[in-house]
């Protein structure tokens, strides 16, 4: 492993040797003609995994969300979304620019949810004065936070009662599934009358996939990113019904997302689904190690991580010194992002030694 410790994002990962081998030997065709066997296999694989009829391989998560919103909505429609969600805040206003679909952003509760009462209040009446509310978009995880399953069920049921479609930006869906599987295991172990002694046993692959599917099945469409924690170099998938994916396919073409011998990339994504889901638990453990290592440092508040993202807020004297922190870390081969609010993301190219180096460097800078 390189001596550099890059904690900026889980998008910085390099393909593993096994992933590179899968890419090198992937059978190829022309996906614009629908003839790339590796792309077709990946689309079938992720659709079946999450319980959908079909899926579409796209270059980016931004394009996946754009295809989803424009497939659910028409010009003059709107979608309800959170202020901090990627498809509102970080995607250049694409749905409004390209589709004349306006967002109706809502404030998040501290746990990342959109209050149910706020969602209901945002749904417009059938009146020519208003944009037509067509879609509820959620993100899980959001800023590394796992949305409670009960909330996901309630919010999507509310949307369904009002005739809204439901889309999940599941860029880190499998991080959510790993965290949820461990939470479900803990609840079972702690339940009255339980005789289980497996509270520390690693959850199985089947348990994680079951939780991913459980989350996904609350929605009409789901976007999954392969190039974050799963470690593939490029690509996302959009899952939904066959009719929905046919609409999304047309939008992908208009957005320039059709690729030719894309099986090289699809093979990397398929390898990640087979080999990199379970290891996400290691990233979560490293995030906890980082958070625990910074706990108690004066002027530093650390949010307990749900998954692989750690947020750190600086106060008082630590805040006054914040401008020099990232250069100090960079001089020691450690990269992160932020100023007064720092973000650290663990991934497959970071190990415990790297996390410990980062902790020591931060504590040393602040005199801890």
Question: How would you name each of these model-derived features?
Answer:
Residues 2-185, 205-350, 358-367:
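Conserved PLP-enzyme active-site core in the AAT-like
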Residues 185-189, 194-205:
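Intrinsically disordered, low-complexity segments enriched in serine/proline and basic residues
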């Amino acid at each position: 492993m390189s001596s550099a410790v890059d904690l900026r994002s889980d998008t910085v990962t390099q393909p593993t040797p096994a992933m590179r081998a899968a890419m090198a030997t992937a059978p190829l065709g022309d996906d614009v003609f629908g003839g790339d066997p590796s792309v077709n296999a990946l689309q079938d694989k992720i659709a079946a995994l999450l319980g959908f009829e079909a899926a579409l391989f796209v270059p980016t998560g931004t394009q996946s969300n754009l295809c989803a919103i424009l497939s659910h909505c028409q010009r003059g429609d709107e979608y309800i979304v959170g202020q901090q969600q990627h498809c509102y805040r970080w995607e250049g206003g694409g749905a409004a620019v390209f589709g004349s679909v306006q967002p109706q952003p809502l404030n998040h509760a501290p746990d990342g949810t959109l209050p149910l009462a706020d969602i209901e209040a945002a749904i417009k009446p059938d009146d020519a004065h208003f944009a037509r509310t067509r879609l509820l978009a959620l993100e899980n995880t959001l800023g590394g936070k796992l949305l409670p399953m009960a909330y996901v069920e309630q919010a999507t049921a509310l949307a369904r009662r009002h005739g809204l479609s439901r889309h999940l930006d599941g860029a880190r869906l499998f991080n959510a599934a790993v965290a949820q599987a461990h939470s479900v295991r803990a609840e079972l172990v702690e339940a009255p009358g339980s005789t289980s002694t497996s509270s520390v046993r690693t959850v199985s692959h089947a348990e994680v996939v079951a939780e991913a599917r459980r989350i996904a099945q609350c929605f009409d469409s789901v976007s999954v990113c392969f190039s974050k924690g799963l470690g593939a170099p490029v690509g996302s998938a959009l899952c939904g019904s066959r009719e929905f994916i046919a609409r999304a396919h047309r939008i992908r073409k208009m957005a320039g997302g059709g690729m030719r011998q894309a099986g090289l990339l699809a093979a990397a994504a398929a390898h990640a689904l087979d080999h990199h889901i379970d290891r996400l638990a290691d990233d979560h453990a490293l995030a906890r190690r980082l958070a625990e290592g910074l706990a108690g440092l004066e002027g530093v508040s650390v949010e307990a991580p749900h998954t692989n993202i750690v947020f750190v807020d600086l106060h008082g004297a630590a805040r006054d010194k914040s401008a020099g922190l990232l250069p100090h870390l960079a001089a020691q081969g450690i990269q992160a992002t932020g100023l007064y609010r720092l973000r650290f993301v663990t991934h497959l190219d970071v190990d415990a030694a790297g996390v410990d180096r980062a902790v020591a460097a931060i504590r040393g800078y602040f005199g801890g």
